[in-house]
Amino acid sequence: MFPRVSTFLPLRPLSRHPLSSGSPETSAAAIMLLTVRHGTVRYRSSALLARTKNNIQRYFGTNSVICSKKDKQSVRTEETSKETSESQDSEKENTKKDLLGIIKGMKVELSTVNVRTTKPPKRRPLKSLEATLGRLRRATEYAPKKRIEPLSPELVAAASAVADSLPFDKQTTKSELLSQLQQHEEESRAQRDAKRPKISFSNIISDMKVARSATARVRSRPELRIQFDEGYDNYPGQEKTDDLKKRKNIFTGKRLNIFDMMAVTKEAPETDTSPSLWDVEFAKQLATVNEQPLQNGFEELIQWTKEGKLWEFPINNEAGFDDDGSEFHEHIFLEKHLESFPKQGPIRHFMELVTCGLSKNPYLSVKQKVEHIEWFRNYFNEKKDILKESNIQFN
């Protein structure tokens, strides 16, 4: 006979979660009341709370001491749970390291994302990695989808030079300048795109028309046409097509002799037209090519005559000088035209210089010289008020 084991451990109340193997609740639920009065073994009903047979722990003994044994499967589950927890911890560490490496390798360009890459002063550091990831996600979400062309290196260098010259924070100043320049570039690009008319291919195709030339096709020579043999069997309807394809030429066939042949073939007289400038220049070039050097004085005189240099014999140096019919002294002695000017003073001195220059000018006629002196007389008469203020007499 075996004595009844009256020692029981406290049991956990019934819950929805299954009991893990090797836990104190499972061992407590597996305690049984052993009796051998009727030769049978009785189990406590609380031992049936576990869902699987492997989780049931059986305890047997020949005395008041309780003997407990664990299944091999429970030991394996504990080892696997430890391994899974360790693998999860290692995966978390690896993911954190990967995220840190990605964040370090990321470079947010100023042209694609309008975010300040430099840390502004008096800003607290981020508390956790999640905050940095959230900010980067927001920046990429609100970033413009279309690609913006980066600024030229000359503008970037100029902005950095301006930032270095200012007493403020260099990085923030440079980023602000570059953002302003980028905004200006975007506005100008948008204006250019708005000015460009949008080409619609459907409108172009709808407006297109097939141009058909009104001119007849080039007439082919009859000898170049393909001529079939006389014994060739014609199919029905070929005669009509041949009649349509035949072309009549006014210069072939039998003449009717209605018009006179000589009157038709006589060419119309060409009208005399003056040679063009290019023809004259070409004739001069031909003459210079064929021209030989002058051998005597007569040939030289002939050449001068062709050039318009005519000489009178005996030689007179004043030939053609008296075209207006004036004498020689009238060209030189011009003091008689200065009677209305003052006898002395700056005006008299100025007019004497004018007459001296006119007397030495062989290209002006006497009439032109007198008109020149009269112009000065009228000019000084108009400026009498100014001359009086300057104490200059003009009588």
Swiss-Prot record:
This is Small ribosomal subunit protein mS31. It comes from Homo sapiens (Human). It is found in: Mitochondrion. One of its GO terms (biological process) is mitochondrial translation. Keywords: Mitochondrion, Ribonucleoprotein, Ribosomal protein, Transit peptide. Its main location: mitochondrion. GO terms for molecular function: protein domain specific binding; RNA binding; structural constituent of ribosome. The keyword Ribosomal protein applies. Residues 70-97, 175-196 are annotated as: Disordered. Belongs to the mitochondrion-specific ribosomal protein mS31 family. Component of the mitochondrial small ribosomal subunit (mt-SSU). Mature mammalian 55S mitochondrial ribosomes consist of a small (28S) and a large (39S) subunit. The 28S small subunit contains a 12S ribosomal RNA (12S mt-rRNA) and 30 different proteins. The 39S large subunit contains a 16S rRNA (16S mt-rRNA), a copy of mitochondrial valine transfer RNA (mt-tRNA(Val)), which plays an integral structural role, and 52 different proteins. The gene is MRPS31. Residues 183-196 have a biased composition (Basic and acidic residues).
